[in-house]
Amino acid sequence: MNKNQKPVLTGQRFKTRKRDEKEKFEPTVFRDTIVQGLNEAGSDLEAIAKFLDSAGSRLDYRRYADTLFDILVAGSMLAPGGTRIDDNDKTKMTRHCVFFAEEDHDAIRNYAQVFNKLIRRYKYLEKAFEDEIKKLLLFLKAFSETEQTKLAMLSGILLANGTLPATILTSLFTDNIVKEGIAASFAVKLFKAWMAEKDANSVTSALRKANLDKRLLELFPANRQNVDHFAKYFTEAGLKELSDFLRVQQSLGTRKELQKELQERLSQECPIKEMVLYVKEEMKRNELPEPAVIGLLWTCVMNAVEWNKKEELVAEQALKHLKQYAPLLAVFSTQGQSELILLQKVQEYCYDNIHFMKAFQKIVVLFYKADVLSEEAILKWYKEAHVAKGKSVFLDQMKKFVEWLQNAEEEFRI
């Protein structure tokens, strides 16, 4: 059965909505238009920004965003891998781009403003620009050292002002640029530019937010992925703040693993001697200081028990439990700082767990008798090193014992 032929409208014109009136260009035609506009604007970045602003109303930035950003950064379209498609035809290139700018922070910052204005004007370019920078970082091997430096500075400045997210840095963990040493060198330049705009806290906060704080070692080949090498490399480059940051982050990761293992051993009621040996080995292997370990031990010991909900019974239960593990704590409280940290941890714990409020003084006295805490540490805590939590309550509890320590004349009775 034949289908009826559908009627055809003749002589009818459909008007395109103004917002859809975009010139239909192939990438090469789009390129030629952008290159011509940049060349006409010359080195006047304000004129370049105005050209890009007005051109967006007639050129299809959404479709050709990668071409647009290739030209603004490298001066021409880039082939996969980063080579310039138009390298032999100077009419298809422009020198008014990031790679031909002066290798100077202020000069690159001025170019960064061009990108900021463009992306503020055409918000849909934000994701495309992020993808472009990720791509360019993968192409680093194809760029000269000075081009790499300028791209690093641009990226650092745009990271600092929030135009780019820190997640772009994942491209630096690619094997081919890591093995060549390009990733680490680029990262140093990028972080320096970032910190010139903001500060170290801005960098470390963004890295944590992007879950990159524990991946920084991946900037180096596998045989050099250790804290010492990272610290030496970044410190010599003038970025000691990042070296210190990585040490802290690695230490935190190590402490979590140590705490997990200790919790397991405590639940299995392992002999204290075995736990002492294990902790000492971990301290040596991971360069953990004693003050960091004592607080962790206190947490593990207190987490190992299901505490009685009745205030009048919990103190007795706590003293019995802590008396058992006092020898373990004593091994790792040989320094004044360690003792003060332990005292502060006990204070915070008793404040945060209301049933322990009245047990604080008894715990401190127990630790004093078991050689976990010294007279000097207790007196220092009492005079100046206590924390704010429950201060008045705990200082009042400790008053008589402190007087006894100070006078050492009359016997203290619990």
From Swiss-Prot:
Keywords: Cytoplasm, Translation regulation. Residues 1-22 are annotated as: Disordered. InterPro entries: ARM-type_fold (IPR016024), eIF5-mimic_regulator (IPR051245), W2_BZW1/2 (IPR043510), W2_domain (IPR003307). Residues 248-414 form the W2 domain. It comes from the Eukaryota. SUPFAM superfamilies: ARM repeat. The keyword Cytoplasm applies. The keyword Iron does not apply. One of its GO terms (biological process) is regulation of translational initiation. One of its GO terms (cellular component) is cytoplasm. Pfam families: HEAT_5MP1_2 (PF25504), W2 (PF02020). It is found in: Cytoplasm. Translation initiation regulator which may repress non-AUG initiated translation and repeat-associated non-AUG (RAN) initiated translation by acting as a competitive inhibitor of eukaryotic translation initiation factor 5 (EIF5) function. Belongs to the BZW family. This is eIF5-mimic protein 1. It comes from Gallus gallus. The gene is BZW2.
